[in-house]
Swiss-Prot record:
Listed Gene3D superfamilies: 6.10.160.10, Ribosomal protein L20 (1.10.1900.20)
UniProt-recorded Gene Ontology molecular function terms: rRNA binding; structural constituent of ribosome
Biological-process GO terms, alphabetical: ribosomal large subunit assembly; translation
Protein name: Large ribosomal subunit protein bL20
SUPFAM superfamilies per the UniProt record, alphabetical: Ribosomal protein L20
Family membership noted in the UniProt record: Belongs to the bacterial ribosomal protein bL20 family.
NCBIfam families registered for this protein in UniProt: rplT_bact
Entry GO CC: ribonucleoprotein complex; ribosome
Gene: rplT
Family annotation (InterPro entries): Ribosomal_bL20 (IPR005813), RIBOSOMAL_L20_CS (IPR049946), Ribosomal_protein_bL20_C (IPR035566)
Keywords assigned: Ribonucleoprotein, Ribosomal protein, RNA-binding, rRNA-binding
Function: Binds directly to 23S ribosomal RNA and is necessary for the in vitro assembly process of the 50S ribosomal subunit. It is not involved in the protein synthesizing functions of that subunit.
Length: 134
């Protein structure tokens, strides 16, 4: 029976792990045991943060839309409600982009949203709740 020497395979595995650990600080970049643990952990973070990234972008789009809509006297929630009642289906990413790059088109959507909301007064700028509070 011939003897199997696994040096080549082990070296290839170690090289793969150390390549993934490139740029890490301290022993994590050059000792195999520390590098393996660090790379495994970094993969877990990457997996988790791919999901978190989606949440963060949605929150950013909502903040941008809210800021743009408040200039017209609406809130984000009422604006979205008005769009739904008007039957306008535009996702938040596109709305955010329109608010930044195409303010005129976004303004048209705001006006369409205001018209669809029945609780706005004839002026179209303030709702009943805001006027009752003052």
């Amino acid at each position: 029976m011939s003897r199997v020497k696994r040096g080549v395979a082990a070296h290839a595995k170690h090289k793969k792990v150390l390549k993934a650990a490139k740029g890490f600080y301290g022993r994590r970049k050059n000792t195999i045991r520390a590098a393996k643990a660090a790379v495994d952990r970094s993969k877990q973070f990457a997996y988790r943060d791919r999901k978190v990234n989606k949440r963060n972008f949605r929150a950013l789009w909502i903040q941008r839309i809210n800021a743009a809509v408040r200039e017209s006297g609406l809130t984000y929630g009422r604006f979205i409600d008005g769009l739904n009642k008007a039957g306008i289906e535009v996702d938040r990413k596109v709305l955010s982009d329109m608010a930044i790059h195409e303010p005129a088109a976004f303004g048209a959507l705001v006006e369409a949203s205001k018209k669809a909301l029945s609780y706005l007064k004839d002026t179209g700028t303030k709702n009943e709740f805001e006027t009752a509070v003052k």
